[in-house]
């Protein structure tokens, strides 16, 4: 195995760690923080036209005020299905139908709910850390295989240090993202 092969693998390791970070940001985006955001609707799918369709493909989602999300559903026959999907989603928001528009007033979070959300955010962050550590383990396994195939001890140490540096950087990014999200959640 040549060093070029390992460099390609380092790029793959970096991409997989970035993927874990992207997944974490997506999870964080779905947490309701008391502020209006279109991202809280991303996980919602509506039974439309015989299949589960993402809500953002059925209408325009706007945030006109800090505590209000407005959905302008394109097909007026879908309004009741969109409303039902939002109610059944468990995000804790009651939609208000106003003609062709659905308004979602975002209620203020109480202290207990804020603490629950910080725990959920910490759980998501831990899942991302585990995913990153699994990528690190896979990278270290590749290095061990390369050593068995004749890689020099110094090269093995260098590549191991690089994989560890990528891991440390990714874990630090997760910790920073978690700290920011918890601060956002606890902000009144």
Swiss-Prot record:
Keywords: Cytoplasm, Protein biosynthesis. InterPro entries: Ribosome_recyc_fac, Ribosome_recyc_fac_dom, RRF_sf. GO terms for molecular function: ribosomal large subunit binding. It comes from the Bacteria. GO terms for biological process: cytoplasmic translational termination. It is found in: Cytoplasm. Responsible for the release of ribosomes from messenger RNA at the termination of protein biosynthesis. May increase the efficiency of translation by recycling ribosomes from one round of translation to another. NCBIfam families: frr. This is Ribosome-recycling factor. The gene is frr.
């Amino acid at each position: 195995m040549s060093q070029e092969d390992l460099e390609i693998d380092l790029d793959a390791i970096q991409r997989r760690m970035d993927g874990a970070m992207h997944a974490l940001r997506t999870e964080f985006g779905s947490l309701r923080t008391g502020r209006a955001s279109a991202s809280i609707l991303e996980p919602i799918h509506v039974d439309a036209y015989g299949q589960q369709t993402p809500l953002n493909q059925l209408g325009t989602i706007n945030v006109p005020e800090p505590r209000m999300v407005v959905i302008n559903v394109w097909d007026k026959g879908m309004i009741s299905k969109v409303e039902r999907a939002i109610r059944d989603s468990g995000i804790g928001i009651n939609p208000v139908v106003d003609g062709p528009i659905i308004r979602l007033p975002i209620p203020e979070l109480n202290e207990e709910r804020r603490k629950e959300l910080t725990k959920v955010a910490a759980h998501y962050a831990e899942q991302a850390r585990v995913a990153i550590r699994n990528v690190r383990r896979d990278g270290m396994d590749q290095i061990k295989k390369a050593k068995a195939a004749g890689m020099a001890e110094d090269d093995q140490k260098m590549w191991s240090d690089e994989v560890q540096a990528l891991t440390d950087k990714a874990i630090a990014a997760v910790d920073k993202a978690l700290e920011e999200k918890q601060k956002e959640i606890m902000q009144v």
